[in-house]
A protein has these predicted regions:
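Extended beta-strand/beta-hairpin segments
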Residues: 1-71, 83-169
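Alpha-helical metal-binding/catalytic segments enriched in His/Glu/Asp
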Residues: 72-77
Length: 169
């Protein structure tokens, strides 16, 4: 098992001593494929295919952007919950997170201006088996998990998004 405190201790010490060293930039690049309903996504450590959802004409053989957003939230929430439980000394047998999102495709297809483009509701369901945990510990686990989950906090408090367009050759 990973000793989380010993792994994070030198990082926390460095970030306290040099706050600027805690700032990172993550990058993802989408590249054109042979079809207008798919692209490759390169995050530097992995490359994967994304497709349009079948409800807007995609083939359904790869994750759509909505799947990836929900997957990012599920991964972040699950890993954050595991890390917080470990840091709090709460033994767990299982931590599973299911994320669902509801949207109306008429918005993205331009069928109705009254229908928003994007998710209307996103729901998270945590399934935690921690037989020895007290109700107070589970309440604190929930609070800290929601507080420290980067993707959840980003969705709750959207950052400024800047776009830049360049005409290629």
């Amino acid at each position: 098992m990973v000793d989380l405190k010993s792994v994070q201790k030198p990082l926390k010490e460095r970030y306290r001593a040099d706050p600027e060293s805690s700032r990172i930039t993550l990058t993802a690049r989408g590249g054109q494929e042979g079809t207008p309903i798919a692209c490759s996504v390169d995050i530097g450590r992995a490359v994967y295919e994304a497709q349009a959802h079948t409800g807007v004409g995609g083939a359904g053989t790869a994750a759509c952007s909505g799947d990836l957003l929900l997957g990012a939230l599920a991964a972040c929430a699950q890993i954050t919950c595991q890390m917080v439980a470990t840091a709090m000394g709460i033994p767990t047998d299982r931590i599973a997170v299911e994320v669902t999102g509801d949207l109306d495709l008429r918005g993205t297809l331009g069928i109705s201006r009254e229908v928003p483009v994007g998710f209307e509701t996103i729901k998270l369901h945590f399934d935690i088996a921690a037989p020895a945990a007290t109700p107070e510990q589970l309440a604190a686990l929930r609070e800290k998990t929601e507080q420290y989950c980067v993707v959840m906090q980003t969705l709750l408090r959207p950052p400024e998004i800047k776009t830049e367009w360049a005409k290629g050759n």
